[in-house]
Regions:
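Hydrophobic transmembrane alpha-helices and immediately adjacent juxtamembrane helices
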Residues: 1-280
Length: 280
């Protein structure tokens, strides 16, 4: 069996084992995959929609103008990416006993953790698509192929981040704690709870008050859109909430970040993987 086939086989088998054990012993089992996203959306919609009176952009083709649905798409997409990176980062340290006893391609641990999470994410996307069908019509069904491509790109990005951070956490155990702090900041910097139009308004208001850079408004929106997580969230919202294809700039950004980070992560992992067991 070639190395590539072995990696794929081990990845699938380990992901299946993780999936089968995830809800083992719970009364509701796989139903939690449907309950969790709905509950999460309800909480965020209540806090940021009702209490803080958040506003959502109007869907391009769907005509939807619901903050609950808008933030719902962002929350489940963010949770997938954030949880995937966290799981990938913890894969090596969390399986140190296995790594010191059995030899197998180390990257399989990161691949399988993200693949198992993607399985749950597929259920959550199904819930969102069903809700969007009810709220905005069947137009969202035409976006499913695009959503699949976006998810595959997001998986590449998440795996790449997992590869980088998993190696870093082996050599520097504080990385896991630092990441939890950074992750909170990153969430709010990715537009999970506020729209691009709200940010544009802030930029315009600041310019009106004299906050400029070389006579031009502060490049808040430009910097904001360099954030890879924001690009993926924008792509998901465009398709699932707006029933429209993302702009070519968003597509280009998602592809560049996905393959760039995955490639970088693979290089770093390959460079340091030989010494992982020694450090563990």
């Amino acid at each position: 069996m070639s190395e590539t086939k072995r990696v794929i086989d081990l990845t699938v088998r380990m992901a299946q084992r993780s999936i089968s054990s995830e809800f083992k012993g719970t009364a509701l089992g796989r139903l939690w995959s449907f309950i969790n996203p709905i509950a999460t959306i309800a909480v965020y919609a209540l806090i940021f929609g009702v209490v803080f009176r958040g506003e959502a952009d109007k869907g391009a083709n769907s005509g939807l103008s619901s903050f609950a649905l808008w933030i719902g798409v962002g929350v489940i997409a963010w949770n997938f990416m954030s949880s995937g990176i966290q799981r990938g980062m913890d894969s090596l340290v969390g399986n140190s006993g296995l790594l010191t006893k059995v030899y197998f391609p180390r990257q399989v641990l990161i691949y399988s953790s993200v693949l198992a999470l993607a399985y749950d994410f597929a259920f959550e996307l199904g819930v969102i698509i069903l809700i969007m069908c009810i709220a905005g019509g069947p137009g969202v069904l035409l976006m499913i192929p695009a959503v699949i491509v976006i998810t595959l790109l997001a998986m590449l990005f998440v795996i790449g981040m997992g590869l980088i951070l998993s190696v870093a956490s082996v050599y520097f155990r504080d990385i896991s704690h630092l990441w939890q702090i950074f992750n909170q900041i990153w969430m709010y910097a990715s537009g999970v709870v506020f729209s691009l139009s709200m940010l544009n308004k802030v930029q315009t208001d600041l310019a009106a008050k004299g906050w400029t850079w070389g006579g031009e408004p502060l490049p808040i929106v430009t910097i904001f859109r360099l954030n890879p997580a924001e690009l993926f969230l924008e792509a998901y919202r465009s398709t699932l909430y707006g029933f429209a294809m993302p702009s070519w700039q968003v597509w280009l950004g998602c592809v560049a970040w996905a393959f760039g980070i995955f490639g970088l992560g693979s290089l770093i992992f390959r460079r340091f993987s030989a010494r992982i067991v020694e450090e563990l």
